[in-house]
Every structure is written in C-alpha cells, then in structure tokens.
Swiss-Prot record:
This is Putative phosphatase YhcW. It comes from the Bacteria. Its EC number is 3.1.3.-. The active site is at residues 8, 10.
Amino acid sequence: MIKALIFDFDGLILDTETHEYEVLQEIFEEHGSVLPLSVWGKVIGTAAGFRPFEYLEEQIGKKLNHEELTQLRRERFAKRMESEKARPGVEAYLNAAKDLGLKIGLASSSDYKWVSGHLKQIGLFDDFEVIQTADDVEEVKPNPELYLLAAKNLGVSPAECLAFEDSVNGSIAAKRAGMKCVIVPNKVTGTLMFEDYDHRLESMAEMELALLLDHLNSQN
C-alpha cells in the first residue's frame, strides 16, 4: 500500500530541463554546432561531469571563453524561468495527496539552494515534509541513496513509496530503491528510452491521483 509520494524536482515539478537544453542548443548553434539530445540526455537527472562548453570546443576545433559562455547561459536561463510555473497537474497532485493523508517528499540531484529557491518562487515549498538534495548524499541519481534517505525521513519503507520522475537516471534510482515509479517525461526527456517503471503519464493532469493510486495498488 502506497503511503508516501516522493517527487523529483527538475523537469518534473518545474521544467527547468527543457529550458536548460534549449539555451545550450542556442549557444551551440551560434557557434555553428549542435548539442545532440543523445549526448545531453545521458546527464539529465544526475551530476555527471559533462562540460558542455568543452564538448563544444571539441566540435568546432577552437578554444572558447568558458566564463563568458557560462554567464550568457545563466542570463538566458534566468530570463526564461521568470514566468515559468509548475507543470500541469503538479499542484492538484500535491493537494490530493494531502487530502488522502499521504506523506510528501522530494528527492533531487540538484543542490538545496537551487531546489528551495525555485519551490518558493512557485509557492510550493511548504507542501513538502522532506526535501533531500545533492547536499545530503555522497552519490546522486541513478544511485538510490536520495530516495532511500527521503523514505527514511518520511518514516516509511521504500516499498510504501511512489516516486514521480521525468528522467531515465531518476527512474533507475527509484526502482533501485525498491519503489514504484511513475514517469512523467517533459518535452526533452520524452524522447529518451525508459526501461524500468510502473506507469507512464504525459502529464499529471492526465489522471487523478486517486485513480492512479488505485491502479498501482491493484498491481500488488
């Protein structure tokens, strides 16, 4: 029986990932190159040491000013995020979870400052009883440590948790932790190949939480 929901953050609650990829793609195109999604997709949802501007240098065969490009990336990303809201259905799921008496947690490979800042900006920070980030663990996703820690601090077993993820690395982490996992891919991650999950939604607005839980609980 599912007693807790644990949400990813980037790309799942707030679609930072699509904007991040599109900003990088703009910069790559301005330098006569492209950033293939097949390359970028491998690092979504984790903290892999991929350095996009080093990759760009390799593609075009010349040195670039990383500091200037990083600043440009930040400015363009911030501009895009000014009016960004939670993905469709997120707030409804959080409210429904509270009505159903479920515990609510968050597990993100990003750092706490990033996650908490964005959650406060969209007014959802107080909805989470537990927020686990990269600051709390030795290894982020696809390692299951973030999910296991979130479950522990919510006072439930991993088997009693339902994880919501948008990335391949995130879904791997949730399943390795022994949780059920619903994937809700975004514009970017929707093109990636997911292997192990329990249900797929294109949006949380697609199905009411109570119906989703009934469906998943019936699989036991």
